[in-house]
Amino acid sequence: MPDPGWAARTPEANDLLLTAGTGVGTHLANQTAWTTLGASHHASGVASAINTAATAASWLGVGSAASALNVTMLNATLHGLAGWVDVKPAVVSTAIAAFETANAAMRPAPECMENRDEWGVDNAINPSVLWTLTPRIVSLDVEYFGVMWPNNAAVGATYGGVLAALAESLAIPPPVATMGASPAAPAQAAAAVGQAAAEAAAGDGMRSAYQGVQAGSTGAGQSTSAGENFGNQLSTFMQPMQAVMQAAPQALQAPSGLMQAPMSAMQPLQSMVGMFANPGALGMGGAAPGASAASAAGGISAAATEVGAGGGGAALGGGGMPATSFTRPVSAFESGTSGRPVGLRPSGALGADVVRAPTTTVGGTPIGGMPVGHAAGGHRGSHGKSEQAATVRVVDDRR
């Protein structure tokens, strides 16, 4: 409805109210938007009609006819919407024209305010000039109240009326679009929504059940872990007992170790006793005198016996020093003839140097820090002992 305040406000207030806004700038922007939207709707309707005409030849059957009918209805509705939009630019254009008309018809606010200022000054000086300014004061009131006020009020009211009419035109709703799908589409959409809700509820229930099972499995795993922890603690508690059981056999082995210590200490004494019991172990196997010179065979046997005895001593003495053999120098013994002339020795006769076997010296094994025994007879000359040479006398009966 029109604004009833136009007649109640002063002329300058109405003019300021009309010109206080943004002017026609917003009206022009709105008009351009409506024009663009209408052109878009028209272009879409035309394109849809062309597409329908181009593809209708390849459609067959009842479905093809129904589809073509639906497309035609939708295109008609789109064109109707475009027609509804086409009205809006004209409405906005009318509003722009109404504003410009009202703005031009309004008495400007400065003019109205100047009238009031002059009226006030005249009233102030009128008594001093013997009321000669009274006609001017009356004319100012007539102009202000008889012309400016009614004019601005009328212009504002007219402008308000035009805008009210245009607002009613803008309030007309757009045409209702026809249903391009099946009439059962809303019911199917509602069923789809219900099915989606049911599936969502079922999914929530399954998730809740899974979470419950998972929580139960977690509790069972925790119980099993608690049992394992108890078993570990029990085994830890039994470890001191196992250590005690392992220490008992070691304690029983200690007395046997104490018995073995004296036996180990007696082993050097036993070795010394065995050494004195066996002369060969002390290197005395070679000290036996040589065999009689009565027969060569007996001498050879005695020499062999001496060597055997020395070998036995070496065998009993151990492997501390290897057995050595040597032949005494010739200057240490008498010659075979002792300076007496003898006949020629027949072949096959044995002399002293042949019968006498080489002296064998066997070293003993060091026992308990004792020095190694000297070879039997090997170093007797150095100790001043006399050596008795073994000789063989051969009698030649062929004379």
UniProtKB/Swiss-Prot annotation:
Residues 375-399 are annotated as: Disordered. It comes from the Bacteria. It holds the Pfam family PPE. Belongs to the mycobacterial PPE family. This is Uncharacterized PPE family protein PPE69. It comes from Mycobacterium tuberculosis (strain ATCC 25618 / H37Rv). The gene is PPE69.
